[in-house]
Amino acid sequence: MTVENINDVEFGEELASFTPDTSLENCSKFARAVGWGGPRFESHEGAQKEGFPGALVPGIMGMGFMTSTIHAWAPSAKIEKIDTIFRAPMIADTASIIGAVVTDIDSDEGLVELDMTIKNDAGETRVLGTATVRIPSSP
């Protein structure tokens, strides 16, 4: 369901999950675009030489995927804050599933709190966090 205004939001509502493109090619392009090019983002072998299990999905890219999930659910929302904890690396070429659930609604202020996760295809939580989102009170 697409949220138009704060009255459309339901406590406990789960946002539609999102599986972004975490291919090595996409992660490499993103890393270079933000000035983070290097083996850990551009090559599985290079990342392994640095002690990682494979090439990494840049952390800010994962946060971007979280914001995409929010805006797909509520296109007119303004994201006030996203707070994340990176529990384990996100690995390129591995499915990442972004999920979120509404955990608080302040109708007077037009604010919604979301608990968010990024899990891999084995169901392991790689990133977790919360988002505070301002949603219009009327369409």
Map each language-model feature to its residues.
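Catalytic strand-loop segment that frames the active site of acyl-thioester-processing enzymes
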Residues: 1-55
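Hydrophobic beta-strand-centered segment that forms part of the acyl-chain substrate-binding groove
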Residues: 48-102
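HotDog/MaoC-like acyl-thioester-processing domains
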Residues: 1-15, 89-92, 99-139
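Well-ordered beta-strand positions in beta-sheet-rich domains
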Residues: 19, 81-83, 128-132
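Short, intrinsically disordered, mixed-charge
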Residues: 32-36, 71-75, 121
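A generic structural signal for short beta-strands and their flanking turns/coil linkers
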Residues: 11, 18, 26, 37, ...
